[in-house]
Structure formats: structure tokens, C-alpha cells
Amino acid sequence: MNAIPMEHGLALSGVLFSLGLIGLMVRRNILFVLMSLEVMMNAAALAFVVAGSRWAQADGQIMFILVITLAAAEASIGLAILLQLHRRFHTLDIDAASEMRG
């Protein structure tokens, strides 16, 4: 079975990261911002796996596990903020977050 060339994997990772970055900059809904962040983190994880497989090292897979763990923590904190924002202001607009003061 032939492996996917490293250039193709890194190109896919770059495209996914760019799409996530565009979504992060364009959207004002906090749910879409969180989804864009997840796409960007998965693109970075894919780049680690592709680079690790190129040199037959397990480092890429270890970094993948680290990135996925970080993404899970980010998602849980982000969803908690999203729920509080929706409960308090009845909106998911990210500009309303500037009014949240504790």
C-alpha cells in the first residue's frame, strides 16, 4: 500500500487551518468561533502526524494526542462560556462577551 506524500498531507493541513482561520475572523457567533478553533487545532494535529510519519517517528503521534487533549479542554471551557453567555444575555454574539463582568 502506498503512503500519501508528505506534501499532500501538509497541503491539506494548510487548507484546513486557513479555513478555520477565516471562520474565526469572519463569524461573530461564539459557537462557530469554537468550531473554527477546533478545525485549526485538528489541522495542526494532522501536520504533526504527517511530519512524524515522514521520518517514521512516534513524536508526531504523541503531539497528536497532546493536541487532541488540549482541544478537548478548550472545547469544554468554551462550551461553559457559551452556556453562561446564552443564559445571561440570551444571545451567542461574541460582542456580548465584553459585557460579562464578574
Curated annotation (Swiss-Prot):
Its EC number is 7.1.1.-. NDH-1 is composed of 13 different subunits. Subunits NuoA, H, J, K, L, M, N constitute the membrane sector of the complex. It comes from the Bacteria. It is a multi-pass membrane protein. The keyword Transferase does not apply. It is found in: Cell inner membrane. NCBIfam families: PRK05715.1-1, PRK05715.1-2. Pfam families: Oxidored_q2. It catalyses: a quinone + NADH + 5 H(+)(in) = a quinol + NAD(+) + 4 H(+)(out). PANTHER family: NADH-UBIQUINONE OXIDOREDUCTASE CHAIN 4L, NADH-UBIQUINONE OXIDOREDUCTASE SUBUNIT ND4L. Signal peptide: none annotated. The chain crosses the membrane at residues 6-26, 30-50, 62-82. GO terms for molecular function: NADH:ubiquinone reductase (non-electrogenic) activity; quinone binding. Belongs to the complex I subunit 4L family. GO terms for biological process: ATP synthesis coupled electron transport. This is NADH-quinone oxidoreductase subunit K. InterPro entries: NADH_UbQ_OxRdtase_chain4L/K (IPR001133), NUOK/Mnh_C1-like (IPR039428). Keywords: Cell inner membrane, Cell membrane, Membrane, NAD, Quinone, Translocase, Transmembrane, Transmembrane helix, Transport, Ubiquinone.
